[in-house]
Amino acid sequence: MPTRRGLLAFAFGAAWAGRGVAAAEPTPGEDGLYHEPWFLQSFLDLREDLESAAAGGKRLAIMWELRGCPYCRETHLVNFADAGIASYIRDNFEVLQLNLIGSRKVTDFDRQELSEKELAQKYGIRYTPTFQFFPPSPDGLEAKDAIAREVARAPGYLKPQHFLSMFRFVRERAYERGSFRDFLAGNG
C-alpha cells in the first residue's frame, strides 16, 4: 500500500522529470543575447532586408537587445514562447536582432555603414528591448532623418497582449490612422 511519503516523493519526481522535458527555453548565444531560430539571418544591409521582407509580403522590424537585459529575456521566454504571438510575427515580419552596444557593421538606408552601437545612437535607441518598425517599402527612406524613417517604435518591454497588438498595429498600417494608444482603445 502506497504511503503518503511515497506518493509525495513520486509526485515530486514526476514534476521534476516533466520540468526537464518542457525546458525548451532559449539560451543565450556567445554574444549573450537570446536568439530565435526564425530571426532574420542578414548581411546587415537595412535596405536589402526591407526589400527582401517586402518581396515576401512581410514587414521589417528591428529588435534591439543588450546582454543581461532582464526584459529582453522576458520577451523571449514569455512573449516569443507564446505560439500564437510567435506564429503571427513569423508569418508577417522579418525580425532583425541587433545589439545596442554591438560592433558588427550595419549599412543604413542612406548607405552609411555604422557599428550597431553607432546605428543605435543615430536612431536614439536608449532602452532594451526596443522594436523599430519600418514602412513596407524603402522608397524615399534615405532622404528622411533617421527617426522619421520609422512608422512605429516600441521602447521597452510590452506584456504579451500589447506586444502582439503592436505588431498588428504595424501590419494593419493603423499608424496611418492614429496612434498606438488609439489602436489599443479601439481594439480592446
Provide a role label for each language-model segment:
Residues 127, 135-175:
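Non-catalytic, surface beta->alpha helical segment in thiol-disulfide oxidoreductase systems
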Residues 86-114:
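Thiol-based oxidoreductase modules, predominantly thioredoxin-like and allied folds used
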Residues 56-69:
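Short active-site neighborhood of thiol/selenol oxidoreductases, capturing the structured segment around
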Residues 116-132:
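Structural micro-motif
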Residues 24-39:
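N-proximal helix/coil linker or "cap" segments that precede and/or mark the start of modular domains
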Residues 6-24:
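N-terminal export signals
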Residues 73-88:
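Typically the conserved alpha-helix immediately C-terminal to a functionally engaged Cys/Sec
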Residues 42-58:
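A short beta-strand-turn-helix
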